Amino acid sequence: MGKTNDWLDFDQLVEDSVRDALKPPSMYKVILVNDDYTPMEFVIDVLQKFFSYDVERATQLMFAVHYQGKAICGVFTAEVAETKVAMVNKYARENEHPLLCTLEKA
């Protein structure tokens, strides 16, 4: 009798593991935050360089950042979002701009 229960427990464990492995990853919004010092052209450059937007869409997003205070640049898995945030913030500091890029759970 104990062996049947052991197999049922094992089957449940495998089923739970497979279900957990198949869950979609958590997604995160990458957000640019407005400031009074970063040039609009630099924000457009960031949107093209790190998010692959064409100049028209990058300009639209830049104006959203400017007038609304922030804008979502994209939604990514945690690892991709963290990498993009780090790269944008590093690039902004290297170019002596206070532009801030953040992430939040989608």
UniProtKB/Swiss-Prot annotation:
Pfam families: ClpS. GO terms for biological process: protein catabolic process; proteolysis. InterPro entries: ClpS, ClpS_core, Ribosomal_bL12_C/ClpS-like. Binds to the N-terminal domain of the chaperone ClpA. PANTHER family: ATP-DEPENDENT CLP PROTEASE ADAPTER PROTEIN CLPS (PTHR33473:SF19), ATP-DEPENDENT CLP PROTEASE ADAPTER PROTEIN CLPS1, CHLOROPLASTIC (PTHR33473). HAMAP family: ClpS. Involved in the modulation of the specificity of the ClpAP-mediated ATP-dependent protein degradation. Belongs to the ClpS family. This is ATP-dependent Clp protease adapter protein ClpS. It comes from Salmonella gallinarum (strain 287/91 / NCTC 13346).
